[in-house]
From Swiss-Prot:
Cofactor: binding comment: Binds 1 [4Fe-4S] cluster. The cluster is coordinated with 3 cysteines and an exchangeable S-adenosyl-L-methionine.
Keyword DNA repair attributed: no
Keyword S-adenosyl-L-methionine: yes
Keyword tags: 4Fe-4S, Iron, Iron-sulfur, Lyase, Magnesium, Metal-binding, Queuosine biosynthesis, S-adenosyl-L-methionine
Protein name as annotated: 7-carboxy-7-deazaguanine synthase
Coiled-coil regions listed: none
Residues binding S-adenosyl-L-methionine, per UniProt: G92, S133, P134, K135, Q173, P174, M175, D176
Organism ancestry: Bacteria, Pseudomonadati, Pseudomonadota, Alphaproteobacteria, Hyphomicrobiales
Organism: Bradyrhizobium diazoefficiens (strain JCM 10833 / BCRC 13528 / IAM 13628 / NBRC 14792 / USDA 110)
Length: 210
């Protein structure tokens, strides 16, 4: 199959359990919860989405004809030693496109593979790190993984709803926007009262990196 990719770039992971880790980000175009167009935001399941995943016009974006071509492009962005190679497959919703062929091609190039997903689509085998970020009002299909990262607060997505699921780590991330200070204070308070949850902040935004 071919892959529609918005952008590919090397950066430090800015949030969640792998914050601070060198990572190649591969952002896939398209999502099943929102078109990505502002005109449709009010009809989106996640109206707070802050990511541009529309089209293929970003850095190294395009339609890749094969898993090998895409994996080679990702590998070319890794400028350090061959140790600790890490790729984050994100979106949009990456599981609309990620398949066995791409997973095999990335593993063959020495990458540990992380995926950031809204959890509404079953994940293929072979992913090394599954981070699910549930969206209120959507059906959660992926009910186990390595990390559940909840943007907080969210209507229809209270943290206690997810505490019994089979995840190794639970992260609470303050919702960005005009009320970020209040949301951060609320998230801190929640984590203090419910230590199963760890605070996740978007460090890449404060550092000015992608």
């Amino acid at each position: 199959m071919s892959y529609a990719v918005k952008e590919i770039f090397l950066t430090l992971q800015g949030e969640g359990a792998h914050a601070g880790r060198a990572s190649v980000f591969c952002r896939f175009a398209g999502c099943n919860l929102w078109s990505g167009r502002e005109a449709d935001r009010q009809d989106a399941t996640c109206k707070f989405c802050d990511t541009d995943f529309v089209g293929t016009d970003g850095t190294l974006g395009g339609r890749y004809a094969s898993a090998v071509e895409l994996a080679d492009t990702i590998a070319a962005q890794w400028t350090a030693s061959n140790d600790n190679r890490y790729v984050v497959l994100t979106g949009g919703e990456p599981l609309l496109q990620v398949d066995d062929a791409l997973i095999d091609a990335l593993h063959a190039r020495g990458f540990e593979i992380g995926v950031e997903t809204n959890g509404t689509i079953a994940a293929p085998d072979g992913l090394d790190w599954i981070c699910v970020s549930p969206k209120g009002g959507s059906e959660l299909v992926l009910r186990r993984g390595h990390e559940l990262k909840l943007v907080y607060p969210q209507a229809l997505a209270a943290p206690e709803t997810f505490e019994g699921l089979a995840f190794e780590r639970f992260s609470l991330q303050p919702m960005d926007g005009p009320e970020v200070a209040e949301n951060t204070a609320r998230a801190i308070d929640y984590c203090l009262r419910h230590p199963q949850w760890r605070l996740s902040v978007q460090t890449h935004k404060s550092l000015g990196i992608r």
